[in-house]
């Protein structure tokens, strides 16, 4: 018996020697986390940037909180809001977590504490951390021009959080936000509660022209400033070849006191026929006639004259218009000259109509097979990639329909044809009804050739529009097409 006990004592002694270091480690860890937590700094997770610390951070950023006694972390708060974290990424000296995208920011609510706060059983650690608001932007300046000292101006835009300064300067700030040497600071301003407008008073000795800068904590927003009015800007035109009698819409900026809209240098739109939006970023008018040559629309407002970038009425690019350019060959379709009493109400002479009631699961219903007149290589060089070209046309959809779709094919290449197409406005991104709209599709979605010359080398003039109804119920449609053209993107 004594030998057995002696043997057991020896085994227990050896086991004790093995367990003792482990207990010591656990004891040290417990001692380490049994103290008040401390945060030393915050860094990014990239090990190569481990020495780069910061206090400003964007929402959605993964960060490492470095400190001491963090192993027992129970809760984490950012801007006084509890945030989630994965306990698998918590050690005694660090916590890895992501700043939530949906966090309420101090820019929106200055009463929040701009800090990260960690709570354990033994205390609380806090560290100043500024979660950045979205970058500010300016769309326009609303004012009565010409602006005089003491006049009220409204800067319209968004994300005007934590405004640090508003100033005028003849120079733009540097890319890093550094101010120019000479600035005219404006101290009398007020930000609205949606952070979308800043109302200010024009200072004495007002600059003739330069830049207005809104300096926020996150970054700065800059816009051109002209005492006598900013130059208008055109960003888009609803159609480059609108049907006569249809409405043309131009979007942009600074359409203030529009005094002239000129079409291709040929004729003006009467000022009384021009409608300007309340925000001066859109004008519209009815096109009274078609220009006889391609050109550009120009808009004259209080700040000067600007031309549209895209060619307006690119007559040289038209490949089919049912009035002398190209020709219809065969197909069950109709041709209409609008008379104002029924759809499409207005037209540039003759247009193609695909109308009627189509039965369900009908894969051969209405079609128009035509010969096109391809654009000359003096207008579109043969080496232009097909990916750089688009097929445009005007389309009128009387009412929304469900089921029927169109196929557009060219050069007998039906394998590459555009299938399942429903007309959509290239301007609004949706199917407009009861009016003409410009549609635009990449030419590469209709043909399989690499270059425009490869396309021409097919030696075919075919262009076809085919209507089918793969839907499970019959449908009635009334759709018109005109002015097919190939243009550069």
From Swiss-Prot:
Which pathway?
A: Glucan metabolism; xyloglucan degradation
Localization of this protein: Cell outer membrane
One GO cellular component term of this record is:
cell outer membrane
User: Looking at the keywords, is Signal present?
Assistant: yes
Signal peptide limits = 1-27
Q: How does it sit in the membrane?
A: Lipid-anchor
| Domain IPT/TIG: residue ranges | 57-103, 136-204, 232-304
Per its UniProt entry, which superkingdom is the organism in? Bacteria
InterPro entries assigned to the protein according to its UniProt record, in alphabetical order: Ig-like_fold, Ig_E-set, IPT_dom, SGBP_B_XBD
The record places the lipid (N-palmitoyl cysteine) at 28
Gene3D superfamilies reported in the protein's UniProt record: Immunoglobulins (2.60.40.10)
Could you tell me which residues are lipidated, with the kind given as S-diacylglycerol cysteine? 28
Q: Which GO terms describe its biological process?
A: symbiotic process benefiting host; xyloglucan catabolic process
Provide the coiled-coil residue spans: none
Mind telling me which PROSITE patterns this protein's record contains?
A: PROKAR_LIPOPROTEIN
List the Gene Ontology MF annotations in alphabetical order. polysaccharide binding
Which keywords has UniProt assigned to this entry?
Carbohydrate metabolism, Cell outer membrane, Lipoprotein, Membrane, Palmitate, Repeat, Signal
| Protein function | Polysaccharide-binding protein present at the surface of the cell. Probably mediates xyloglucan-binding before xyloglucan transport in the periplasm for degradation.
Q: What else is known?
A: Gut bacteria supply the human body with energy from dietary polysaccharides through glycosidases that are absent in the human genome. Xyloglucans are a ubiquitous family of highly branched plant cell wall polysaccharides present in the vegetables we consume. Enzymes involved in xyloglucan degradation mediate the conversion of otherwise indigestible plant polysaccharides to short-chain fatty acids.
Protein name as catalogued: IPT/TIG domain-containing protein BACOVA_02650
Organism name:
Bacteroides ovatus (strain ATCC 8483 / DSM 1896 / JCM 5824 / BCRC 10623 / CCUG 4943 / NCTC 11153)
């Amino acid at each position: 018996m004594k030998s057995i006990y002696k043997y057991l004592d020896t085994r227990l002694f050896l086991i004790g020697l093995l367990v003792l270091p482990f207990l010591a480690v656990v004891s040290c860890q417990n001692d380490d986390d049994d103290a008040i937590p401390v945060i030393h700094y915050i860094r990014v997770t990239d090990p190569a940037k481990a020495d780069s610390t910061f206090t400003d951070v964007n929402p959605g950023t993964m960060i490492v909180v470095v400190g001491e006694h963090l192993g027992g972390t129970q809760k984490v708060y950012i801007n006084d809001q509890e945030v989630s974290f994965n306990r698998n990424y918590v050690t005694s000296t660090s916590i890895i977590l992501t700043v939530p995208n949906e966090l309420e920011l101090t820019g929106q609510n200055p009463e929040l504490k701009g800090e990260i706060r960690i709570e354990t059983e033994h205390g609380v650690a806090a560290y100043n951390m500024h979660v950045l608001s979205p970058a500010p932007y300016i769309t326009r300046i609303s004012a009565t021009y010409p602006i005089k000292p003491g006049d009220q101006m409204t800067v319209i835009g968004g994300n005007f959080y934590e405004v640090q300064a508003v100033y005028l300067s003849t120079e733009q700030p540097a890319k890093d936000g550094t101010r120019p040497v000479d600035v005219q600071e404006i101290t009398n301003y007020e930000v609205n509660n949606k952070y979308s407008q800043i109302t200010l008073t024009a200072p004495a000795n007002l600059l003739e022209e330069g830049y207005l800068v809104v300096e926020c904590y996150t970054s700065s927003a800059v816009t051109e400033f002209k005492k006598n009015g900013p130059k208008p800007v055109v960003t888009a035109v609803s159609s480059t070849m609108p049907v006569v009698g249809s409405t043309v819409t131009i979007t942009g900026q600074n359409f203030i006191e529009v005094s002239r809209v000129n079409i291709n240098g040929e004729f003006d739109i009467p000022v009384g026929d021009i409608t300007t939006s309340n925000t001066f970023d859109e004008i519209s008018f009815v096109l009274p006639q078609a220009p006889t040559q391609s050109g550009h629309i120009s808009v004259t407002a209080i700040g000067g004259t600007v031309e549209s970038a895209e060619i307006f009425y690119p007559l040289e690019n038209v490949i089919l218009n049912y009035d002398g350019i190209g020709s219809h060959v065969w197909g069950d379709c109709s041709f209409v000259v609008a008379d104002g009493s029924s759809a499409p109400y207005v037209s540039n002479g003759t247009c193609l109509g695909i109308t009627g009631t189509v039965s369900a699961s009908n894969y051969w219903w209405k079609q128009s097979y035509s010969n096109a007149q391809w654009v000359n290589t003096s207008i579109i060089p043969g080496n232009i990639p097909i990916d750089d070209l688009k097929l445009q046309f005007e389309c009128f959809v009387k009412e929304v329909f469900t089921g029927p779709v169109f196929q557009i094919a060219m050069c007998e290449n039906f394998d590459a044809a555009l299938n399942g197409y429903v007309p959509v406005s290239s301007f609004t991104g949706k199917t407009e009804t009861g009016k003409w709209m410009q549609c635009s599709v990449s030419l590469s979605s209709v043909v399989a050739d690499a270059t425009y010359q490869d396309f021409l080398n097919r030696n075919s003039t075919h262009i076809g529009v085919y209507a089918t109804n793969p839907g499970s119920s019959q449908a009635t449609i009334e759709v018109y097409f005109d002015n097919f053209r190939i243009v550069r993107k």
